[in-house]
């Protein structure tokens, strides 16, 4: 959301780690009791060592509580490595803004998409993620995933069936 909401970028890929660190530091000044998760930007977790280096830096410099990475099966080894190194990880599946090609659209309409979402959700859970964001996932598959896994699901346009919801103030106010 940082790139699109605050900078009016057409893609989140323009957001870099330095930008995320500065904004997360600012948020930390106001957030005292809530869990604060930093979104690792595109190309900052391409492999385990890069992910660990950038995650450690993010936690140290911002005093945030966890990192968020996009992807399921394709990032499971990175997630496992971070968790083994005591970095709490929030996963993110469904519509993944860092890798979306073309227009944003809901995910989980076809059997193939549904099966991929379930595989991704299970992979994140098995890798040790403490929760996952489901973005723009059809209601029935969000409900199925939420019942299937034991970690919390947080929906962004993914129905009332998730355990929690993300509400972007700028989206609400227009």
Question: In which residue ranges do the predicted regions lie?
Answer:
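Alpha/beta enzyme core
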Residues: 1-174
């Amino acid at each position: 959301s940082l790139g699109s909401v605050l900078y009016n970028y057409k893609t989140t890929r323009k957001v870099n780690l330095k930008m995320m660190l500065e904004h997360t530091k600012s948020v930390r000044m106001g957030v005292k009791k809530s869990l604060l998760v930093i979104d690792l930007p595109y190309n900052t977790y391409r492999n385990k060592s890069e992910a660990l280096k950038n995650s450690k830096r993010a936690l140290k410099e911002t005093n945030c509580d966890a990192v968020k990475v996009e992807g399921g099966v394709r990032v499971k080894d990175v997630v496992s490595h971070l968790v083994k190194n005591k970095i709490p990880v929030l996963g993110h599946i469904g519509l993944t803004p860092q890798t979306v090609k073309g227009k944003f659209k809901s995910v989980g309409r076809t059997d193939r998409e549904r099966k991929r979402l379930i595989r991704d959700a299970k992979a994140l859970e098995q890798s040790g993620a403490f929760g996952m964001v489901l973005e723009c996932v059809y209601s029935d598959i969000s409900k199925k995933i939420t019942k299937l896994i034991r970690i919390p699901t947080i929906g962004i346009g993914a129905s009332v069936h998730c355990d929690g919801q993300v509400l972007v103030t700028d989206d609400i106010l227009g």
